[in-house]
Amino acid sequence: MSDDRLSVAIIGSGNIGTDLMIKIMRNSKLLKVGAMVGIDPKSDGLARAQRLGVPTTAEGVDGLLDMPAFRDIKIAFDATSAGAQAIHNQKLQAHGVRVIDLTPAAIGPYVIPVVNFDQHVDAPNINMVTCGGQATIPIVHAVSKVSPVHYAEIVASISSKSAGPGTRANIDEFTETTSKAILEVGGAAQGRAIIILNPAEPPLIMRDTVYCFVSAEANIDAITDSVEQMVKSVQEYVPGYRLKQKVQFEKIVAGNEQNIPGLGWSTGLKVSVFLEVEGAGHYLPSYAGNLDIMTSAGLTVAERIAGSGVQVGGLK
């Protein structure tokens, strides 16, 4: 029987790459893992891939290009680092391979599956922003659909144990990329992103706070409905994504103005949304919702590409 699933490569055998491999192998009807790529021959991810019968290389992207399996690769997930992504992308694009970038490199357009995938379905490189971006930008977008968002601020709190060397090396890129995507994808006029590595034991699941500053006359019921519908949409591919409590509203009145970036001292309406993200526990512990939402979003994008009929590359 023929196997019509799209063959993908995963570059990076750490937490994100390994979780993504297991998600695809367990759940995907449209994709198959054609190669797992690392640089540490002793990594758990490469060892696990070998046990599962996945072709592997510990020679990085150059090793991937030399693999017989590379001829069938149509999409490559990059789960390494922002610095390495530029090199990987150049080499893969030369062979017509679509790249789904799970680093903050932002070479391609920012994509949040529930917000703007359809606009970038044919992009050769798709950037998945960051874990904090995947969790919070849908909420900023949900508010901005109802009322102009003058300023949005997100705070992503993740367990220190879930932050591997790649995450820690990309902290500056995380804040920069997420802040830009709050504007470009979320629709806010101004934005800021903060990440907190929480050392608490036992480890806590990912928690995110989204603040949006809107005009005082904004429709509270419409904002609440829009946010709740967006949460349901994200839950379709991240079941552990949820509101921690009801959407909160605070009227900022004359005499109690707040200093809003880009606006100065202002009155208006402050919208606060509190989220938590529990991981599915495929490879990573359930507290690592920050990694789970990235792999789930990346998988969703790849499956939509596979099911879209858009031509994908690779050597013939």
Swiss-Prot record:
Identify which residues the record assigns to the active site. C131 (acyl-thioester intermediate)
GO biological process entries:
catabolic process
Instruction: Give the matching InterPro entries.
Output: Acetaldehyde_dehydrogenase, Acetylaldehyde_DH_C, NAD(P)-bd_dom_sf, Semialdehyde_DH_NAD-bd
Please provide the record's keywords in A-Z order. Aromatic hydrocarbons catabolism, NAD, Oxidoreductase
Q: Where does NAD(+) bind?
A: S13, G14, N15, I16, S162, A163, G164, P165, G166, T167, R168, A169, N170, N290
SMART domains documented for this protein? Semialdhyde_dh (SM00859)
Q: Which residues form the signal peptide?
A: none
Q: What class of enzyme is it?
A: oxidoreductase
Quote the Gene3D superfamilies the UniProt record gives: Dihydrodipicolinate Reductase, domain 2 (3.30.360.10), NAD(P)-binding Rossmann-like Domain (3.40.50.720)
Report the SS bond pairs: none
The EC number on file is: 1.2.1.10
Q: Could you tell me what reaction this enzyme catalyses?
A: acetaldehyde + NAD(+) + CoA = acetyl-CoA + NADH + H(+)
An example molecular function term from Gene Ontology annotations = acetaldehyde dehydrogenase (acetylating) activity
Its job: Catalyzes the conversion of acetaldehyde to acetyl-CoA, using NAD(+) and coenzyme A. Is the final enzyme in the meta-cleavage pathway for the degradation of 2-aminophenol.
The record's NCBIfam families line, in alphabetical order, gives: ac_ald_DH_ac, PRK08300.1
The family note in this entry says: Belongs to the acetaldehyde dehydrogenase family.
Which protein are we looking at? Acetaldehyde dehydrogenase
Name of the gene:
amnH
